[in-house]
Design a protein with these regions (language model features):
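Rossmann-fold dinucleotide-binding core
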Residues: 1-43
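Acidic-enriched, low-complexity/disordered segments with a strong bias for Aspartate over Glutamate
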Residues: 15, 23, 63, 90, ...
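Generic structural hydrophobic/aromatic packing signal, biased to beta-strands
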Residues: 1, 83, 118, 147-151
Length: 169
């Protein structure tokens, strides 16, 4: 738990009692800011990996991509395998978080486009049947190919679909 501001002493007493408390000291808002910076990093990476995997599926290059990643970037492949099925479980609330992060980036003069795109990926994930589940009811042994099929089906079922979005195979 991150805390900041002048009145953190009471919360700091919880440190080590089932809770890890990190005092960022300084002005109020630093704790919220680190949460946003961290979330923009983690969820931004998850959504980039999701977009890459879906693109590979749509272009018929999934196997080739996964082979290349297994040889050159095994940690990236492991992240895709771990996170792609999980994104839909929280996507509904993460959509708004991506909007908030994008606005913060924009207010700081940094491009907001990446996290606007991350929000789009969250919306796509939220349209899959996987989004009807929770972390407790998730299907944990679902094959990645099946997960990707759900994402592609959500694209294909989206109203106003353009020719560019249709699978090439």
């Amino acid at each position: 738990l991150y805390v900041s501001g002048k009145a953190t002493a009471l919360v700091r007493q919880l440190d080590g009692r089932g809770l890890g408390v990190r005092d960022l000291s300084g002005e109020i808002g630093r704790a919220s800011a680190i949460k946003m910076v961290y979330a923009s990093s983690t969820k931004g990476a998850f959504t980039l990996f999701a977009a890459v995997a879906v693109m590979a599926e749509l272009t018929g290059l999934r196997d080739e991509l996964f082979q290349e990643l297994s040889e050159s970037q095994p940690n990236t492949l492991a992240s895709i395998e771990r996170m792609l099925p999980r994104i839909p479980l929280d996507a509904n609330r993460w959509i708004f978080e991506m909007d908030e992060i994008a606005s913060t980036y924009e207010s700081l003069g940094v491009t907001s486009h990446f996290h606007k795109g991350a929000g789009d990926i969250m919306q796509l994930a939220n349209r899959t049947p996987l989004a009807t589940r929770t972390r407790e009811t998730a299907i944990h042994d679902l094959a990645l190919t099946d997960v990707l099929r759900h994402y592609v089906d959500a694209i294909n079922q989206n109203e106003g679909q353009t020719e560019k979005q249709k699978p090439t195979r």
